[in-house]
Amino acid sequence: MVALVKPHGADELTPLYVADEDARVALQREAETLPSVVISSSAAANAVMMAAGYFTPLTGYMNKADMLSVADNLTTADGLFWPVPILNMLKDVSAIAGAKRIALRDPNVEGEPVIAVMDVAAIEEATDAELEAVAEKVFSTTDKQHPGVANFLAAGNFIVSGDIQVLNYSYFADDFPDTFRTAVSIRNEFVERGWNNVVAFQTRNPMHRAHEELCRMAQEALNADGILIHMLLGKLKAGDIPADVRDASIRKMVDVYFPPNTVMITGYGFDMLYAGPREAVLHAVFRQNCGCSHLIVGRDHAGVGDYYGAFDAQTIFQEKVPAGALEIKIFEADHTAYSKKLDRVVMMRDVPDHTKDDFVLLSGTKVREMLGQGIAPPPEFSRPEVAQILMDYYQALDAGK
């Protein structure tokens, strides 16, 4: 009997996608008659996550009171534990002023089709000072060089809140038909496979040897039935490797180096926030909604630059997440690297006798340089099959310059 962890804040998932085809067609027809507005990429990604059940139990976009409460207390105004405001922020609301029901248009799909219909609860204005205070709490900085802060502060001062009905999954279902999955379908597949105890690995990058072994370590330590490799498919910062390349490299690694039927490779439709500790908690919330019992949280999880301490994304679970707020557990990981002494990948904290020279360590910049020149990183760092896919990508990129 499979008994998965319960969804967050609910007995069942609450996906906001209109699954009934007749109802969806009728809603689409209605949408074309409604006042409409093109929303931000971030707001569209929020709609996709709500559509797919990942953001259970939310029924729509948060209001200003929720935004301020989540930023200050990690709870919505009515007390639901939630780490990051889920917002529809606009610069201009003249097209929807006074409207009670509106159509939301997708900026990421050609022709800007309607992605959702919204019952408008409120249109509220936040001051620049209020938004900066929220950024400070959520991102731990107001520095506009931080990509998440830059996006948040550029989104607009109007907060449009209310329940939504979602018509589609934006570009994710079409562009990533084999990888994009809803929380509903992931949870159902766990049941079909008989997996009770599942460890999730979050990634926005290709997976090298250290990541591969980290998944194995977690699976063995937790006696997990399987691993969910769950990759972000939405927008990243400039210079990050696109989702289709990451997808291909991860699939190759799993095909060659993991036993059959022990790993599920899936993706979710969200734009990276780079919110470090707060985003790590959000990752835990929606992996619980998928049915995962554990989430691997390592060094610099969901971070960028030097904005966060190496283990801030772990300590937030002890310091800011109340007991009982989440059912999912965290598998705390240190940096993993190949030990020349032991001839295997280890967690660096487990080998206090090692010096830096005892590990195969390469910076991201160095790896990018090598791949661009057609030089494979050492096999202790990256599997040759993975390195080949990445070399092909970087060389094509350089050739196109």
Curated annotation (Swiss-Prot):
Protein's pathway: Sulfur metabolism; hydrogen sulfide biosynthesis; sulfite from sulfate: step 1/3
GO biological process, one term: sulfate assimilation
Pfam family, one: PUA_2
Keyword annotations from UniProtKB, A to Z: ATP-binding, Nucleotide-binding, Nucleotidyltransferase, Transferase
Protein name: Sulfate adenylyltransferase
Recorded family membership: Belongs to the sulfate adenylyltransferase family.
InterPro entries: ATP-Sase_PUA-like_dom, PUA-like_sf, Rossmann-like_a/b/a_fold, SO4_adenylyltransferase_pro, Sulfurylase_cat_dom, Sulphate_adenylyltransferase
